[in-house]
Amino acid sequence: MILAQTIIAQGDASIKASVNKNKILLGEPLVLTIESYFPSGSKIQFEQIDTIAHFEFLDKPVIDSSSENGGIKVIGKYTITSFDSGHWVIPSFTLAKGVKTDTIPIDVVFSDFNP
């Protein structure tokens, strides 16, 4: 189930960012998926993400690419977590001028205490 998703397109290029949950416990894994599409032969490239404030990467990203409708589709899946409680925001990602995702809010909480 995708809880947050943004899609922005300009011309034939597009980018979409989504997460599998918007609220996690401290240290709980979260999967960030970034899908981009751009026309074949364009100078647009998929940028690797290596840092996101307040989040840590748990594994190397899984990147997959395929040909689709005369262009290239690239999907990157990133397993991340946070050890900082609070309301954090995954920033927007830019594919090209004017082609970027919205930000994605994430709440990082302590576990509920039930004595």
For the regions a language model picked out, list residue spans one by one.
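N-terminal signal peptide c-region/cleavage motif recognized by signal peptidases
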Residues: 4-6
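Surface-exposed interaction/ligand-binding surfaces
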Residues: 8-115
